[in-house]
């Protein structure tokens, strides 16, 4: 059985941006904060603490090969699932960081509409993107088919990420069976808000704030030392406490020496508390550090 074109595209994007991951925390807080790529299958249940996600695999299903490391565009291959016996269907669980997406979408519906527009002409997607509720959370749903395979992609927004479940099956009934299994999803915390309200605080997650809305809260910063290969980039997620102290640095991707340069610089940054509804709150934001090419060298005779 072949994988869906969407899965191949997603994996190829991940491979293209495959780099060493570095997770650096200020002080002794590394174990306190989960990261998206930390999900795993344990005793038949896929668990990802960053998204608060718990998904019990259908009976007879197992984890397939591990996917690529997170990419420079913030794409995560979280888990690939398959049946132990005949390969009648597959499921890919992935996530796209909204802060670093090549073409950021406003919401999960926009994400799937963009995907639909980008489908190969050999694929058929006559239905509009629909909406379903899975595990008490609103998801957008895209159905398409081609080459004798049925595809269903489900997406929702959590912590400024598109969380994606991609299903490929030989028969439509097998695909729908997997959708039914997703109705038993559980989320340990409520979804994080993307605006300044108390939803994220009630849910126990930091408030998700884009860089454009948080830049005024940077009180002091130190630029990273320009090092490593030309044209490199390091996307970073930061968690800043309600008191304005830097709590966690997650360098998503990057060349090792550039990741080291960025994290060492960030450890010296200072922030102002972020106020939401009159109260200082913990926030999560994203920054992209670019490493430009070295300036041209002058001839010794100039």
Task: Write out the residue ranges for each language-model feature.
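Signature of long, low-cysteine stretches enriched in small and polar/charged residues
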Residues: 109-158
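Bacterial N-terminal signal peptides
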Residues: 12-22
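Charge-biased low-complexity segments
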Residues: 29, 33, 63-65, 71-88, ...
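N-terminal "mature-domain start" segment
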Residues: 30-73, 134
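Bacterial N-terminal signal peptides that target proteins for export
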Residues: 2-14
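Short acidic-hydrophobic surface loop/beta-edge motif
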Residues: 44-48, 78-81, 130-132, 142-144, ...
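Sec/Tat signal peptide C-region and signal peptidase I cleavage site
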Residues: 24-26
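Short, isolated positions in well-ordered beta-strands
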Residues: 53-55, 139, 163, 281
């Amino acid at each position: 059985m072949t994988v869906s074109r969407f899965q191949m595209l997603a994996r190829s994007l991940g491979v293209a941006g495959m780099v060493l991951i570095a997770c650096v925390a200020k002080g002794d807080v590394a174990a306190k904060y989960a990261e998206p790529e930390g999900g795993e299958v344990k005793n038949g249940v896929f668990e990802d603490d960053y998204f608060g996600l718990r998904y019990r695999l259908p009976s007879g299903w197992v984890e397939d090969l591990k996917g690529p490391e997170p990419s420079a565009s913030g794409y995560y291959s979280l888990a690939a699932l398959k049946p132990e016996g005949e390969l009648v269907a597959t499921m890919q669980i992935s996530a796209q960081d909204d802060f670093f997406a090549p073409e950021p979408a406003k919401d999960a519906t926009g994400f799937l509409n963009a995907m639909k527009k980008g489908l190969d002409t050999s694929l058929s997607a006559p239905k509009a993107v629909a909406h379903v509720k899975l595990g008490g959370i609103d998801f957008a749903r895209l159905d398409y088919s081609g080459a004798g395979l049925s595809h269903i992609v489900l997406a929702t927004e959590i912590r400024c990420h598109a969380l994606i479940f991609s299903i490929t099956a030989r028969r439509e009934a097998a695909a729908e069976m997997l959708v039914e299994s997703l109705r038993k999803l559980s989320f340990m915390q409520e979804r994080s808000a993307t605006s300044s309200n108390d939803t994220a605080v009630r849910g126990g997650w930091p408030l998700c704030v884009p860089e454009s809305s948080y830049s005024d809260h940077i009180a002091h910063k130190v630029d990273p030392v320009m090092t490593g290969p030309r044209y490199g980039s390091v996307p970073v997620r930061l968690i800043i406490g309600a008191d304005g102290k830097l709590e966690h640095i997650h360098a998503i991707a990057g060349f090792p020496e550039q990741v080291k340069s960025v994290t060492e610089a960030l450890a010296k940054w200072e922030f102002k508390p972020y106020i939401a509804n009159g109260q200082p709150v913990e926030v999560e934001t994203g920054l992209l550090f670019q490493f430009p090419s070295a300036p041209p060298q002058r001839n010794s005779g100039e």
